[in-house]
């Protein structure tokens, strides 16, 4: 492979590493001053110990940085192959829609926030489908696939939250609705997990729903909560099992290997 193209690829991957760093950073910032994971705090920042209003600005800044580095990755990757450019572009569009959703939430336009998070979910799904058509190596899984699927799960939860503003009757069953919706997500991911052996999406979804069903929800709606916890575990453990079986099929290649250089 041409050295210039190889250099562009490494630059793009390094940009996406920065995206992961920002994503992890913003999650950690939400836990400042909190020892126990609070229920639905990913969906509802007002439940965080960190200032909700300040969190909106921090999240917006991080998403803008994500967009910049993802767009840079798409630009670098366009010289390598159009299919990879498409993945990075879809990731960029999803991040932009997510940013618009938080912005509309900040100014009180709940309907526009709902539309924005719906669009973010759409672009996330397209990114995941595009990735599923490719062979996997650990670089692609860790740098591209995991951030996309983390954003997808978060956007689905935000989509559920803002759907209540579009369907006023759901406000009367706020708690039950969220719990039931999480179970539906679990069921869908479980089906996709068996169908595509997508251990990354299965594990992240199962773990997120497991964490979101802690605390007061268990005492408020014990039957639905425990059912969610059970289905979460039924997703997490098969995900690990599938990973153990499929691990040998992944190409654990280094940057210096010729096969890695010719991967895309």
Swiss-Prot record:
Question: What are the GO BP annotations of this UniProt entry?
Answer: meiotic cell cycle
Q: Which residues form a coiled coil?
A: none
Regarding the membrane, this protein is recorded as:
Multi-pass membrane protein
Q: Where in the cell is it found?
A: Endoplasmic reticulum membrane
Keywords assigned by UniProt, alphabetized = Endoplasmic reticulum, Meiosis, Membrane, Transmembrane, Transmembrane helix
Membrane-spanning intervals of the chain:
18-38, 54-74, 84-104, 140-160, 174-194, 199-219, 223-243
General function of this protein: Has a role in meiosis.
Q: What is this protein called?
A: Meiotically up-regulated gene 162 protein
Tell me what organism the protein belongs to.
Answer: Schizosaccharomyces pombe (strain 972 / ATCC 24843) (Fission yeast)
Native organism taxonomy: Eukaryota, Fungi, Dikarya, Ascomycota, Taphrinomycotina
Gene name of the record: mug162
């Amino acid at each position: 492979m041409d050295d210039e193209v190889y250099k562009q690829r490494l630059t793009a991957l390094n940009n996406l590493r920065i995206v992961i760093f920002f994503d992890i950073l913003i999650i950690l910032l939400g836990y400042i001053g909190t020892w126990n994971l609070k229920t639905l705090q990913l969906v509802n920042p007002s439940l965080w110990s960190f200032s909700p209003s300040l969190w909106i600005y921090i999240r917006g800044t991080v998403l803008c940085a994500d967009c910049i580095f993802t767009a840079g990755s798409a630009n670098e990757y366009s010289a390598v192959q159009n299919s990879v450019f498409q993945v990075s572009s879809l990731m960029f569009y999803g991040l932009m829609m997510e940013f618009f959703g938080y912005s509309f939430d900040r100014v009180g336009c709940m309907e526009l926030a709902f539309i924005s998070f719906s669009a973010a979910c759409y672009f996330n799904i397209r990114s995941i489908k595009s990735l599923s058509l490719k062979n996997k190596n650990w670089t692609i899984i860790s740098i591209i696939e995991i951030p996309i699927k983390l954003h997808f799960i978060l956007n689905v939860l935000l989509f559920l939250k803002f759907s209540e503003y579009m369907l006023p009757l759901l406000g009367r069953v706020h708690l039950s609705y969220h719990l039931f919706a999480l179970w539906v997500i679990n069921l869908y991911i479980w089906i996709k997990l068996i169908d595509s052996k997508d251990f990354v999406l299965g594990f992240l979804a199962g773990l997120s729903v497991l964490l979101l069903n802690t605390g007061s929800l268990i005492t408020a709606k014990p039957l639905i909560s425990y059912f969610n916890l059970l289905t979460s575990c039924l997703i997490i453990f098969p995900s690990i099992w599938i990973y153990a079986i499929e691990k040998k099929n992944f190409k654990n290649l280094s940057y210096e290997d010729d096969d890695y250089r010719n991967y895309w």
